[in-house]
A protein has these predicted regions:
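Short edge-strand/loop segments of extracellular domains
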Residues: 51-55, 107-108
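Beta-strand signatures of extracellular beta-sandwich domains
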Residues: 47-51, 101-103
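Short solvent-exposed strand-capping/beta-turn motif centered on an Asx-Ser/Thr pair
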Residues: 36-41, 53, 93-95
Length: 108
């Protein structure tokens, strides 16, 4: 098994939920950290979720406020394991307001 560290990003996330990362086939992924930066001119509220193909979708973060010019790193040492075809999503209550940075380790 190979372990590969990767950085995934998604700029200008807004009201429409965006896929930041989809786990490739034959891969397990460990999410090491997620940072959400507010790039808008005002405060906004964000959410992070996991969409799974064969089970319930879940929220990791819901309606979390991020002040103007600030960022949020909400995992604080916790890890989340994702399986093949799981999708990590981000949304905001303000268009083009969030830059999302995801640090992961893929196990293949």
């Amino acid at each position: 098994m190979a372990n590969t560290f990767k950085l995934k990003t998604k700029a200008n996330v807004g009201i429409t939920t965006q896929n930041v990362y989809v786990v490739p086939s034959a891969t397990t992924t460990v999410v090491i950290g997620i940072t959400l930066a507010n790039t808008s001119g005002s405060g906004c509220v964000v959410g992070v979720g996991i969409t799974r193909p064969s089970t319930d979708d879940v929220k990791l973060l819901k309606n979390a406020p991020i002040p103007q010019g600030s960022s949020l790193e909400f995992m604080q040492g916790n890890k989340v394991v994702l399986e093949t075809a799981d999708t990590l999503t981000v949304n905001s209550d303000t268009n083009n307001s969030i830059d999302a940075t995801l640090t992961i380790m893929e196990i293949t």
